[in-house]
Amino acid sequence: LPHFITNVAIPCVKLSNLDFYFLPERLLVKRGNTFAAVFYKNLQISGFTTRFIEDERVPGDAKVVDHTWRYVNKHGGPDRRFNNNRQLPICAYSEYTLTSDTGIYEVLMTSKQGAMDAFAGFLCQIGNLQSQMKLADIR
């Protein structure tokens, strides 16, 4: 962020079309030239493990939990009509949903299970502290 001067490093997650900046008291979301900000007390983060069919190279930190076929017949086996029907790994990925009552709705997926669990918990703790503070204290 070129216009911000801080005395701490600002953690940032850059995605294809948006950036998350985790400021000390709020999340700043940048999409193009548009910014949105939300206090952590107004941010909900939920996470769970999901099964993801990986059609490309499996990341080194991913856990393969099963396999399937690119083309499946009605019994769940390989569809023999396709000669390029290769087996695909099913990986256990973590999916995190960030929402707020101000309109933020973003979904992040990590190939490493639980990769953001501790960080999400930390942000929730900050939000809990903000909820206990008076409004004037966090402005």
Q: Where is each model-derived feature located?
A:
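A composition-biased, non-transmembrane "mature-region" signal
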Residues: 1-139
